[in-house]
Amino acid sequence: MITELHGIDIRENEPLKHYTYTKVGGPADFLAFPRNRYELSRIVAYANKENMPWLVLGNASNLIVRDGGIRGFVIMFDKLNAVHLNGYTLEAEAGANLIETTKIAKFHSLTGFEFACGIPGSIGGAVFMNAGAYGGEISHIFLSAKVLTSSGEIKTISARDMAFGYRHSAIQETGDIVISAKFALKPGNYDTISQEMNRLNHLRQLKQPLEFPSCGSVFKRPPGHFAGQLIMEANLKGHRIGGVEVSEKHAGFMINVADGTAKDYEDLIAYVIETVENHSGVRLEPEVRIIGENL
């Protein structure tokens, strides 16, 4: 118990595999669940004062946490999940579930968020990664975000300053943490929006191994190619290291089929990169983030 942070939900030596989509990850020294910006500021101020590292884990969907875990504070925004509408502008806190947020937009007959209807993760992580699918991405509807800087200051960042690119945003370099974000939507027809979301979710269910733990799409799309196609052509579908294998359903995914570890994921990623490069001459670049310490 840290007496200076009394009243905040903080768990010591907490295994992170219970919170990640991959079902891997060692312990966090301290795992914190702030309920509001005040509690978040208290955690960051304490960590900075004590020279303790801290990071925000988000919804841990496109992420691998190593088996040795993470030192210092890991902050999760599960309780910072409010969503508000002001006309055609939707504002969501960083911990809001991305899929549920698209359903709120649909309920109010607002169009623009359909592309994200099946993307797992949080609003904060989606902004960080400029998440996208089926021709849409966060940058297409993003207005601004409130962020927390490493020094504990809260500031607003515009779409221009975010410098979005393919699975990229400026905050990947600055280390700023999204607290909330605003999105510009447009009035639409409820039935049309609903039909499009159903169509995209059907495609996702057909093509992706949603029945297994995974980190989502492992590799960025190489120019002029598709990562899954290159992996398939290198005869890597079903290739397994430890408890993790390249999905038979979609070669761009790696799934945890038998109590796999983060090391299994990393070893399989490295093997796929090397094998694909030897086969096609194309070097794949991981989209998934890998953080933490090895055992």
Curated annotation (Swiss-Prot):
It catalyses: UDP-N-acetyl-alpha-D-muramate + NADP(+) = UDP-N-acetyl-3-O-(1-carboxyvinyl)-alpha-D-glucosamine + NADPH + H(+). Residues 23-188 form the FAD-binding PCMH-type domain. One of its GO terms (molecular function) is FAD binding. InterPro entries: FAD-bd_PCMH, FAD-bd_PCMH-like_sf, FAD-bd_PCMH_sub1, FAD-bd_PCMH_sub2, MurB, MurB_C, MurB_C_sf, Oxid_FAD_bind_N. Its EC number is 1.3.1.98. One of its GO terms (biological process) is regulation of cell shape. Pathway: Cell wall biogenesis; peptidoglycan biosynthesis. GO terms for cellular component: cytosol. Coiled coil: none annotated. Its cofactor is FAD. It is found in: Cytoplasm. The active site is at R167, S217, E287. Keywords: Cell cycle, Cell division, Cell shape, Cell wall biogenesis/degradation, Cytoplasm, FAD, Flavoprotein, NADP, Oxidoreductase, Peptidoglycan synthesis. Disulfide bonds: none annotated. Its main location: cytoplasm. Cell wall formation. PANTHER family: UDP-N-ACETYLENOLPYRUVOYLGLUCOSAMINE REDUCTASE. NCBIfam families: murB, PRK13905.1. Belongs to the MurB family. This is UDP-N-acetylenolpyruvoylglucosamine reductase. It comes from Streptococcus pyogenes serotype M49 (strain NZ131). The lineage of its organism: Bacteria, Bacillati, Bacillota, Bacilli, Lactobacillales. The gene is murB.
